[in-house]
Design a protein with these regions (language model features):
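Conserved S-adenosyl-L-methionine
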Residues: 152-156
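Hydrophobic anchor at the start of a short beta-strand
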Residues: 48, 134, 157
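Glycine-rich adenosine-cofactor-binding loop
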Residues: 22, 113-116, 123, 132-151, ...
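Phosphate/diphosphate ligand-binding glycine-rich loop within oxidoreductases
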Residues: 10-127
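Anionic-ligand binding region
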Residues: 157-164
């Protein structure tokens, strides 16, 4: 479990480290986005790093680093990270997929899936009448969140992708 590693961190300095875990993530805009966000919000003690992993087991190396407060999770580790966590939010548990990891003061680590919330909220803000059918473009990590929302809203859907 990640709680062991969280407790290994020192709170001597007040730098709060956040980051993204995934594979082949050099393309990700997350580091730049959060760097700008931290600057805008005058959060001088926060940093955001990309942690490019080949295998989920490499996560343990990251967790020995000091002052990790949260991680975003991307492909292909959204499902693979679940066994490493102490608890899951209800949505993450239903999906068996996590895109956000929170490190708590008590040393425990929780997993959340914000893809579902974000997609559902965005959809309901722009569409007043829900369709009966939908087409999901792609079968990547976020497509499972879109499908989850489609099922929840009773919208019939199909996938289309290069590999499906």
């Amino acid at each position: 479990m990640l709680a062991y590693w969280r407790n290994m961190g020192s709170k001597r300095n007040n730098i709060k480290r956040y980051g993204l875990i995934g594979r082949n993530i050099s393309y990700s805009f997350s580091r730049g986005y959060f760097k700008q966000k931290f600057e805008t919000e005058n959060l001088e003690n926060c940093t955001y790093e990309n942690f490019d992993l080949n295998e989920i087991e490499e996560l343990n190396k990251i967790l020995t680093k000091k002052n990790i407060y949260g991680l975003n999770v991307t492909t292909p580790f959204k499902r693979e990270v679940v066994p490493f966590l102490d608890r899951l939010s209800p949505t993450a548990e239903k999906m068996n997929a996590v895109n956000t990891i929170k490190f708590h003061e008590d040393g425990t680590v929780s997993g959340h899936n914000t893809d579902v919330y974000g997609f559902e909220k965005s959809l309901l803000e722009i569409i007043s009448t829900l369709p009966k059918k939908a087409l999901i473009l792609g079968t990547g990590g976020a497509s499972s969140a879109v499908a989850f929302v489609m099922k929840k809203l009773n919208i019939e859907f199909s996938y289309i992708s290069r590999t499906a």
